[in-house]
């Protein structure tokens, strides 16, 4: 059994066998999507979240063990490793406890205490610290020599040694840490010389602000830290000094007299010069780390919602990147997203060629039999939407407004240049907008998630940790939906379980050379795609109209024999099982349970037979803004308006109501009941009905509310 299995099982409240089997599968190279979907019998039906937590905790414990080994080696090299100390380090459970144990042995720059020791003052420090000598000044005379010119200098040196001892005392650090944990205050003050600058005003709420650190939300803490990094604010973390000193005095001072008085001075020095700065640094770092983790959670949750947004599906689309001066870039895409045609229209100021633009669009819609129009939500979006809605088409055409966050990043990227080497960035951007309507997931995987604009303080968090979490989110979403093996780009394929950039490129190259895949088993002919990668990826790849209908389902090829046996027992074909509910009702799942195939897998198989390759995403809905509200001046307090959720943060949700400025629904205005997490009430791109609560024309701020309103 793995050394960490029992601890992980206890911490996560999971079955020990489930944890052990999961670690074995992970260590064997299994991906989280594959393990959660196709190894349910071994994991005890753990979901992706639980498996991810096991993997993360295993990594943390491994790193912690390496740190222990490094510390043991360092202390051993110094010749100070005792059996008792080794045992304490081996059994240590917390990183802070481990570092406290190491602190007395940690190599340091030359300190005041070290200088005092070199001057031979350690015996005097020990005598004073024992607090039994009634006349320490007299004893100090014996140490007056060399650079120690008098009694006071000797005693101060001895106090430096005592202060170091107090600072490194495990119990002292534990008690002071506990005071900070429960009572630390975070304080923010404006730097006076920056107060009146325009850039400082966005931090005005924190010019003179304080609250208990344990209650400080991640967005407030990160806002203060950003203000600090921009030179606007001074931020500090502190606790009650008197409370801390009281605890230290109780620990170290014994009675009254000359020596206890000297120790009292050393206690104050130890706290103010060593312990206090150490704790302030520790809790500043810890609180920011926790705030960053929460911010990354919010970003990952938002990204998941964006990636799993409802797709229009394979329809012919007109993609429009709106603009005023340079016009609107318009592209015609076929049902697979291929670019057929593009041109520019200029219905808006300064050109105002409304009639010419109308003829252009109506002709494109007719010539290319366009079924839907996707309009980017940036500059001139509302005006372009109104323009499109005023046109007459000879067949029904749906119109959608699509988020264009990151489209400009894509249009200038290597990926876009590969796809459209002969088109400029404006055409590429319009294509991206059109494709996002057809299949948001397939298009958004081409863009760095950090460019999509659905996070909070994303530039203030650990960028490596952010990338790791966002990549995990993309992988989870891609595999949850499944990928069309014959149409997917190399970028989309690279996120499929068991693949990656090299194998995904090899699949695309094989497809170009040999034509469309007709069965999953052909994947084994792709260069460098062996049995292990095939086992990991096959069930997440779909082949519509394949010879074997299971190749267009989430049934794993290793389970095909089970399905064939079911069909044989029912006296029908696999196709019949899929088409006929009557045939499926004949199946007794218990008859097919084996050592490796249990009820969880069999239940999943039946669900897939009912609807092979089902898409977990919702159906897309058409949305329209209030036609009477087009800019900030049209708004009035009390108005009830339709809107689209564009971003979700810890403090609320931003909503586009069609006036070129998103409004904010504060968390307290999201519902008639208490809301702890905005994500429990609203989702990205959700259509909502809101009431205008407050308007600030100077700062272009709109406060909205959903309280007392029936959600759409």
Please place each PLM-identified region on the residue numbering:
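Generic start-of-chain signal for non-secretory N-termini
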Residues: 1-20, 27
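Long, highly charged, low-complexity intrinsically disordered interaction regions
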Residues: 4, 62-80, 90, 409, ...
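Short flexible coil/turn linkers enriched for glycine and charged/polar residues
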Residues: 15-16, 28-29, 95, 109, ...
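Short, ordered loop/turn segments at secondary-structure junctions
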Residues: 38-40, 129, 240, 322, ...
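Duplex nucleic acid-engaging cores and interfaces of nucleic-acid transaction enzymes
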Residues: 50-53, 60, 64-74, 78-319, ...
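Structured, non-catalytic alpha/beta "coupling" segments that mediate domain-domain communication
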Residues: 74, 88, 98-101, 227-240, ...
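A glycine-rich phosphate-binding loop feature that marks nucleotide/adenosyl-phosphate handling sites
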Residues: 178-185, 320-324, 378-383, 402-409, ...
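Single-stranded RNA-binding regions, centering on S1/OB-family and related RNA-binding modules
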Residues: 543-712
